[in-house]
Amino acid sequence: MTIKRKKVSVIGAGFTGATTAFLLAQKELADVVLVDIPQLENPTKGKALDMLEASPVQGFDANIIGTSDYADTADSDVVVITAGIARKPGMSRDDLVATNSKIMKSITRDIAKHSPNAIIVVLTNPVDAMTYSVFKEAGFPKERVIGQSGVLDTARFRTFIAQELNLSVKDITGFVLGGHGDDMVPLVRYSYAGGIPLETLIPKERLEAIVERTRKGGGEIVGLLGNGSAYYAPAASLVEMTEAILKDQRRVLPAIAYLEGEYGYSDLYLGVPVILGGNGIEKIIELELLADEKEALDRSVESVRNVMKVLV
């Protein structure tokens, strides 16, 4: 009996896509297909070959190919979308909507054609709106179209808390809700260091500064790079989500999910805690929010809906 190997296709062979592909292969989670536009087919093949040639050194067994032909992605278990125009310094996420939504629709049609049973994970910004666009175009069940932002935003939040307390990031837990933008909602009340509430360890003004830095985390890196945006942490976040799906781990992770009444919102994709497993989003977890937390989430939802108004 032949055992079918897992297959993940990564759409977009830029910094984030290529890093994601390499991390997936390193962890031996699946065979990887790295896809980009025909004009970039040779560089995409070159990156894939370069990764493959690292396998004897890194000690992993996974096949990696580069292509511009979506037929090569057929029967993927998971498809990760990182393609889209890059965010530039001073550029708002809203500016990305019109162009990237057109790109999403084109990509999604190819995914649906060749991998109708896949789970799609979207990274392209503005990710809440782009995930909604992919969902509408694909016609897949809502649990199989997921956006990635909460894992990344929470990772940034945890990093800054660990730095503040001079503790291991492994001992920091937390959640960031809402849209992936300046109105995201880091939930201090649900965040802990070794099980101890942060509010007992960090002064209020320092916590407020950490929350604000988390909200501006992506922009901080964009400004420092001068060209392009973050890719190591986004790629690592995509891999964590993909692993939870492929291994049916049923991880509790923040992810962008389609809401139908949860938290009082409907017909939009928003970052919320979910159980992530082999079927995609197995369950949306509704946290009890205080009045000020709900007001902050309302503002975040308003920002997401404003971006969605310009979807094409």
Swiss-Prot record:
Pfam families: Ldh_1_C, Ldh_1_N
Gene3D superfamilies reported in the protein's UniProt record: Lactate dehydrogenase/glycoside hydrolase, family 4, C-terminal, NAD(P)-binding Rossmann-like Domain
Active site: H180 (proton acceptor)
GO molecular function: L-lactate dehydrogenase activity; L-malate dehydrogenase (NAD+) activity
Keyword set, alphabetical order: NAD, Oxidoreductase, Phosphoprotein, Tricarboxylic acid cycle
Keyword Phosphoprotein: yes
Residues given in the record as substrate binding sites: R87, R93, N125, R156
One GO process term, biological-process aspect: tricarboxylic acid cycle
EC primary class: oxidoreductase
EC id: 1.1.1.37
Keyword check for Kinase: no
Entry binding sites for NAD(+): G12, A13, G14, F15, T16, G17, D36, N100, L123, T124, N125
UniProt modified residues of type Phosphoserine: S149
Catalytic activity: (S)-malate + NAD(+) = oxaloacetate + NADH + H(+)
Domain of life: Bacteria
Similarity field: Belongs to the LDH/MDH superfamily. MDH type 3 family.
NCBIfam families, alphabetized: MalateDH_bact, PRK06223.1
Stated role: Catalyzes the reversible oxidation of malate to oxaloacetate.
HAMAP family from the UniProt entry: Malate_dehydrog_3
Name of protein: Malate dehydrogenase
Organism name: Bacillus anthracis
Lineage of the organism: Bacteria, Bacillati, Bacillota, Bacilli, Bacillales
Gene that encodes the chain: mdh
